[in-house]
Amino acid sequence: MASNQELVQIATNFLLNAPPCEFMEVVSDVRALLPSESLLNASAGSTFREYNTSQMVSVQTSKGSALITKEGEISNNEYLDPKNKQVITYDHIKQEVTGERSASGEIEQDIEQYRAAFDEEATKYCNEYYPNGVSAVYGTKVSEGIKITVCISTCIYKPNAFYSGRWRSVWTCTFKPGSGNVTSNGKVQVNVHYFEDGNVQLNTVTQKQTTSPSADAQSTAVNAFKAIGKAELNLHTALDNNYSTMGDTTFKALRRALPINRTKINWQKVKNFKIANELNK
């Protein structure tokens, strides 16, 4: 029989791999499976926090939407919301914002014009391509000049249609203002769960890199997002093509249309033959 430590590890793995927008449903199921609720409570704080930050869940504040991300984490329950220039306190267990304060001191003012320009373009980009998406843009100085980190997360949950999904992308853009190129390294994660008469999940992680010219703050941001948009569109197109190919080949191969002798069985003839045999007894 599994030890309590092993049970906690199994439960943690279930929770961290919960499908998009279905975390609390999985929590309820795991709670019912464990012999004692104390086993779940023992690791809930760290597990819930890991799930929320890795999934970049969106939350509502008094000033609008924000993301809970590792990139914006100040402490275990405080997260920078640079767009609204505030720090939010988030209760990972209750899944709600419990406080807000000014972000003065948390934002590097000497590069804020670049961060703000990227933030503006990120908002436009989300509005155009991810209507349910939320973005967060962080900025800091590095040896290479400026590093802008763009986080985008969008989730859809359609239980009546038996599916849910989340798109997450993190782009790290480094450049020297006004000279050279912007190098943007992206990590895109797509998770889809389909659960009508079964349980099928897609989990894909893709690394991308783009370059774009660096100029003034606004032009730098516009050029960077043109390159990012092209890279994400190519990924989206590739996923669509792969699924089309899988539907026409791979999935069909899982269920053989003809038996091994390549001849269809006449089930009506077999049925009639069986009935005739029964009548002749």
UniProtKB/Swiss-Prot annotation:
- What biological processes does GO assign it? actin cytoskeleton organization; barbed-end actin filament capping; response to bacterium
GO MF terms listed in the record are: actin filament binding
Query: Would I find Membrane among this entry's keywords?
Result: no
Cellular location(s):
Cytoplasm, Cytoskeleton
Q: Which InterPro entries match?
A: CapZ_alpha, CapZ_alpha/beta, CapZ_alpha/beta_2, CapZ_alpha_1, F-actin_cap_asu_CS
Keyword check for Cytoplasm: yes
* Pfam families associated with the record: F-actin_cap_A (PF01267)
* Subunit and partners: Component of the F-actin capping complex, composed of a heterodimer of an alpha and a beta subunit.
- What family name appears in the similarity comment? Belongs to the F-actin-capping protein alpha subunit family.
Q: Which PANTHER family has this protein been placed in?
A: F-ACTIN-CAPPING PROTEIN SUBUNIT ALPHA
Annotated protein name in UniProt:
F-actin-capping protein subunit alpha
- The scientific name of the source species is Dictyostelium discoideum
Gene expressing this chain: acpB
